[in-house]
Amino acid sequence: MNRTEKEQVISELHEKMAKAKAAIVAEPKGLNVAVVTDLRKKLRDAKIDYRIVKNTLAARAAKGTPVEPVADRFVGPTALVMSYDDVVTPAKLLADFMKDRENFVIRTAIIEGKVIDAKGVQALAKMPGLKELRGQIAAMIAQPATKLARLVGTPGQQLARVVGARREQLEKQA
């Protein structure tokens, strides 16, 4: 890789690191091409970047970005997973991926400016994602309106039942 290519990689990585809400630094040892391709596809479908990075270039790119505090963890084989919207989804996908693989290890992460360790990433993976939270909030907002509609409708239903029962009673007498 010549100097121009390196500068281009640094510039591209710097731009992505600056926009990332979540960046997870992992160690991908002993993974075959099919497994990595499958992981990349799952992450890409969730709009998450996965890159095997050259440590020196990644460390230079991290300067002046939210990822800078974890730049010292760019040692050995390094994969960088970056998300620009949801901070929980990458943790969930990586935790799911790691269930069957001991070789893939999360070193550290930076989530919205806060450095967390591998255990913190595992804990984050157990939290509901952005879409799930939105669904829960929508359900909580809709619930009082549903209850109110039921309460408003109940007296009318009861009155209709009483009138119907009285009508049947009068019909039987006639």
Swiss-Prot record:
Cited CDD domains: Ribosomal_L10
Keyword list, A-Z: Ribonucleoprotein, Ribosomal protein, RNA-binding, rRNA-binding
GO molecular function: large ribosomal subunit rRNA binding
Name recorded for this polypeptide: Large ribosomal subunit protein uL10
One GO cellular component term noted in the UniProt record for this chain: ribonucleoprotein complex
Disulfide bonds: none
Origin superkingdom: Bacteria
Function: Forms part of the ribosomal stalk, playing a central role in the interaction of the ribosome with GTP-bound translation factors.
Gene3D superfamilies per record: 3.30.70.1730
Pfam families cross-referenced by the UniProt entry: Ribosomal_L10
HAMAP family in the cross-refs: Ribosomal_uL10
Gene: rplJ
Native species: Anaeromyxobacter dehalogenans (strain 2CP-1 / ATCC BAA-258)
Subunit relationships: Part of the ribosomal stalk of the 50S ribosomal subunit. The N-terminus interacts with L11 and the large rRNA to form the base of the stalk. The C-terminus forms an elongated spine to which L12 dimers bind in a sequential fashion forming a multimeric L10(L12)X complex.
Family matches, as InterPro entries: Ribosomal_uL10 (IPR001790), Ribosomal_uL10-like_sf (IPR043141), Ribosomal_uL10_bac (IPR022973), Ribosomal_uL10_bac_type (IPR047865)
GO BP annotation list: translation
Family of this protein: Belongs to the universal ribosomal protein uL10 family.
NAD is among the record's keywords: no
